[in-house]
Amino acid sequence: MASLISDIEPPTSTTSDLVRRKKRSSASSAASSRSSASSVSGEIHARWRSEKQQRIYSAKLFQALQQVRLNSSASTSSSPTAQKRGKAVREAADRALAVSARGRTLWSRAILANRIKLKFRKQRRPRATMAIPAMTTVVSSSSNRSRKRRVSVLRLNKKSIPDVNRKVRVLGRLVPGCGKQSVPVILEEATDYIQALEMQVRAMNSLVQLLSSYGSAPPPI
């Protein structure tokens, strides 16, 4: 009878072997996905350090600055101030940087979308607004107490947030298009945006040196 029961019962070693194999396969697949994601992000970040990308951006930046100069000279209004010219140059440099990114990142798409929104606002006609008479509001003491209670709760919630998350949120407000994103997305976009800005500075320095050497060159005989 015992031999018959032993023949019927399945061996437990096969089940444990299957569990171990599943764990092994899941761990290997997760490691491969992490390695592939890291390699892809590394390739994306490495493009800003290449000379080819810097040449592409320098060409786009030169075209954008020429367009800014043409727009300022063709303007019928008075000559723009230094502050307006500086703002136009910064916007042109950022747009050229976003175009060089080819819309692969959130910050580049946000810069291009912001440009489209500003252009659409300029094209819209101003609507006539009706003057709304001022209305006096009476605030009761109970509403004041509830407002103070809400403010105190918000302060407690702010104190309970870790410093790291709060700093990351501040960083997200500095990176275009990342104000409401998660922490991993903010860190990934900020890394790419910082490297793009570093490449922008290198391209601008090279352009300034080129223009200064061209201006100081003696005239041809």
UniProtKB/Swiss-Prot annotation:
BP-aspect Gene Ontology terms: regulation of DNA-templated transcription; response to hydrogen peroxide; response to oxidative stress; response to salt stress
Cellular localisation: Nucleus
Induction description: Slightly induced by salt (NaCl) stress.
Location (main, coarse): nucleus
Phenotype when the gene is knocked out: Hypersensitivity to salt (NaCl) stress during seed germination and during seedling growth and development. Hypersensitivity to hydrogen peroxide H(2)O(2) and methyl viologen (MV).
UniProt keyword annotations, A-Z: DNA-binding, Nucleus, Stress response, Transcription, Transcription regulation
InterPro entries membership: bHLH_AtIBH1-like (IPR044549), bHLH_dom (IPR011598), HLH_DNA-bd_sf (IPR036638), IBH1-like (IPR044660)
Annotated ranges, domain bHLH: 148-197
Domain of life per record: Eukaryota
GO molecular function ontology, one term from the record: protein dimerization activity
Residues spanning the signal sequence: none
Low complexity composition bias: residue spans: 26-41, 72-82
Region (Disordered) location: 1-45, 70-89
Gene Ontology CC terms, in alphabetical order: nucleus
PANTHER family listed in its UniProt record: TRANSCRIPTION FACTOR BHLH148, TRANSCRIPTION FACTOR IBH1-LIKE 1
Function noted in UniProt: bHLH transcription factor that binds DNA on specific sequence 5'-CANNTG-3' in target gene promoters. Negatively regulates brassinosteroid signaling. Together with BHLH148/RITF1, regulates the transcription of several genes involved in the detoxification of reactive oxygen species (ROS) generated by salt (NaCl) stress. Confers tolerance to salt and to the oxidative stress-inducing reagents hydrogen peroxide H(2)O(2) and methyl viologen (MV).
Subunit structure: Homodimer. Interacts with PRE3. Binds to RSA1.
Name of the molecule in the record: Transcription factor bHLH148
Source species of the chain: Arabidopsis thaliana (Mouse-ear cress)
Gene encoding the protein: BHLH148
